[in-house]
Design a protein with these regions (language model features):
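Structural core segment of the AMP-binding/adenylate-forming
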Residues: 2-15, 122-193
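Gly/Ser/Thr-rich phosphate-binding loop
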Residues: 287-289, 307, 315-319, 329-400, ...
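Conserved ATP-binding/catalytic segment of the ANL
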Residues: 421-481, 616
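Conserved structural elements of the adenylate-forming
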Residues: 81-87, 196-203, 212, 231-257
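Conserved pre-ATP/AMP-binding loop-to-beta segment of ANL
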Residues: 57-60, 179, 185-189, 193-220, ...
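Conserved AMP-binding/adenylate-forming core of the ANL superfamily
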Residues: 37, 58, 62-114, 134-144, ...
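Conserved AMP-binding/adenylation subdomain of ANL enzymes
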Residues: 239-264, 271-319, 325-336
């Protein structure tokens, strides 16, 4: 937006204004608590499903594209109740229960949703596993670790053949295995066979025993700091997050709110993480929404599917990673029909997983103004597998980078840690502790019972805390240069990546105990493919062009950074992609800064070698 330009108003966000209480303790610790009380919430998620099925049995609940025809297939709330009752009975017959989970190896689908909800109905924890552990791994070590941790009674893989090797790597002889497709093995049953099971009173009896302490899922941490850790996610934790959001809800604030409009949610985020499963999917059930399963992803090969799906459903809310929003902005700037479809019902845009750049924020607002005449609220929620959602931006923010303020029911404890404020949290959505990990649990909870996230935050304005909190990096990722100057990786890294967009996929910052900071970057696959095409297939020439371009952007970044803690003096382009087996990257696309630096110590040494090594660029 041009400086001094008068901007149109926001579409009003249907949420209450910030109202928090801040208490200071001895030693500089700050406690932050919202004054709003939690709102309504369901008894459990399965109870919520059954209630919605009774209220509107014929309303579309799930929509998923048939991979063969490309046509949308619809499952109603009433059908979902019937199917989950039948599957729940089948799981009981197979011996599933509170101590015998149901493991899901395949990704988001209507059938996977039914399996997850059916398991919860009988108190059997659902354990959705990151798909790359089965399909992208070569040693299956993380998959075997997850299997050994939860000891499932039942395993589901939608298509058996792609998962055959992964399942064979498990000690699964005692497990019941089923798939949507005939597997050619007598021991593997079909999904349709289980759906044909006649439910008995045992399902209702098991469901009646569910309470806040019932474990709904085992969600595994992303493995970005070692092997994935199993997090018991209770019904109480999931429903408390719904209650926290309801405590902020104020539909009357939006004069255009139509209570008869069925919300449309379009989402690709994997259900083995809280954002896709506990925030978006559970929230859709609570709101009686229609959940469109997005078969696209923010990659050059798959994002067109997301664009096509937006045209079909005109979602009322849309949340994704900033990289996907950048791709969407590119598409909408070139296509007014897509622009109109996207903003037709849109009430807010959400993002997470990385910082949204000022440039992308401005582009999205310009598109919103073009389509609607107003700006759109762009919000985010901050949390972790262990805590569910902790904070949310619940007002029309004029800036990016905020993580918001705590949800009703949650209390933040901000503890001085060097020059930063380390964030800790307590509340009903925080896990009771990792499964069978007493030593680890003793490490992650402090003396007051607050969970320690390892992140740092800062106030936008400490004199006006209602303006919100800003993410200030990981406490353990920051390092000192030889001069004693601290380098804040958590802010430098995303700022550099944003400045170099769209050339790079990600970057890591090196320099601990060195005289200066340096950077290693991964090229964007789409950009490199374009450079190779321009170079007539000459990959070496394409790499030189890329290196020259990224060096130019890096020098421009340095020009605006006067301090040594923010200036990068050398650059190396990485050719080996981040390894999921080694834990360098998760299925969410999060790159583990510390692990990459440790695993590629030889490259770090090369960056700092004298004279300048081949491939290293002096900035």
């Amino acid at each position: 937006m041009a400086e001094g330009q008068t901007l149109p108003p926001f579409r009003l966000l249907p949420m209450k204004a910030p109202d928090i209480e801040m208490t200071r303790a001895e030693g500089g610790t700050i406690y932050v608590t919202p004054r709003q009380a939690p709102g309504d919430r369901p008894k459990t998620v399965p109870h919520c499903l059954d209630e919605r099925a009774a209220e509107h049995p014929d309303r579309p609940f799930l929509r998923e594209k048939d991979p063969a025809t490309g046509e949308w297939q619809t499952l109603t709330y009433g059908e979902a109740k019937s199917i989950t009752d039948s599957l729940a009975q089948a799981f009981l017959d197979m011996g599933a229960g509170p101590d015998a989970p149901v493991m899901i190896l395949s990704g988001n689908s209507t059938r996977a949703a039914m399996v997850i909800l059916a398991a919860q109905k009988i108190g059997a924890p659902a354990a959705p596993i990151s798909v790359p552990y089965s399909l992208m791994s070569t040693d299956y070590e993380k998959l075997k670790h997850c299997f050994a941790a939860v000891k499932p009674a039942v395993i589901f893989a939608e298509q058996y053949e792609p998962f055959r090797k992964a399942i064979s790597a498990l000690n699964s002889d005692a497990c019941h295995i089923f798939s949507a497709e005939p597997a050619g093995e007598n021991s593997v049953r079909t999904y349709d066979d289980l759906v044909a099971t006649e439910p008995t009173d045992a399902v209702a009896s098991a469901m009646a025993k569910l309470d806040d302490g019932s474990i709904a899922k085992y969600l595994f941490t992303s493995g970005s700091t070692g092997m994935p850790k199993p997090v018991p996610t209770t019904q109480g934790a999931m429903c408390a997050m719904i209650g926290g959001q309801e405590g902020l809800r104020d539909d009357a604030r939006d004069p255009e709110y139509d209570p008869d409009l069925i919300p449309n949610v379009l989402d690709w985020l994997p259900w083995n993480h809280i954002s896709g499963s506990n925030v978006n999917f559970n929230g859709a059930i609570w709101n009686g929404a229609t959940f469109w399963i997005d078969d696209g992803k923010p990659t050059p090969a798959l994002f067109q599917r997301t664009i096509d799906n937006i045209r079909d459903c005109s979602p009322s809310s849309f949340g994704t990673a900033p990289i996907a929003l950048a791709m969407l902005a590119d598409a909408m700037e070139a296509d007014d029909t897509l622009l109109a479809a996207f903003f037709k019902n849109m009430r807010s845009i959400g993002y997470g997983g990385a910082t949204l750049s000022d440039d992308l924020y401005d582009r999205l607002q310009a598109l919103a103004i073009k389509a609607t005449g107003r700006r759109i609220p762009i919000i985010t929620m901050y949390g972790a597998t262990e805590t569910q959602g902790i904070t949310v931006v619940h007002w029309e923010a004029e800036r990016v980078g905020l993580i918001g303020l705590p949800l009703p029911g949650m209390t933040l404890k901000l503890v001085p840690n060097g020059a930063k404020l380390e964030v800790r949290v307590k509340g009903p959505s925080v896990m009771p502790g990792y499964l069978n990990s007493p030593a680890k649990n003793a490490e992650v909870f402090d003396e007051e019972g607050y969970y320690c996230l390892g992140d740092a935050v800062t106030f936008v304005d400490e004199n006006h805390p209602e303006k919100g909190l800003v993410f200030d990096g990981r406490v353990g990722e920051d390092f000192k240069l030889s001069s004693g100057t601290w380098v804040s990786v958590g802010t430098l890294r995303p700022d550099f990546v944003a400045a170099c967009s769209p050339l790079i996929f990600d970057a890591v910052i090196a320099g601990q105990d060195k005289d200066y900071a340096a950077v290693m970057v991964w090229p964007s696959q789409a950009v490199m493919e374009q450079y190779v095409k321009i170079a007539g297939g000459d990959k070496a020439r394409a790499m030189k062009t890329f290196t020259d371009e990224i060096a130019h952007k890096a020098r421009a970044f340095n020009a605006g950074e006067p301090g040594s803690s923010r200036r990068l003096k050398r650059l190396l382009v990485l050719t080996e992609p981040p390894s999921i087996d080694a834990g360098e990257i998760t299925d969410k696309g999060y790159v583990n800064q510390r692990l990459v630096i440790d695993r590629r110590a030889d490259l770090v040494s090369r960056i700092y070698s004298e004279p300048l090594a081949d491939g290293v660029v002096q900035l």
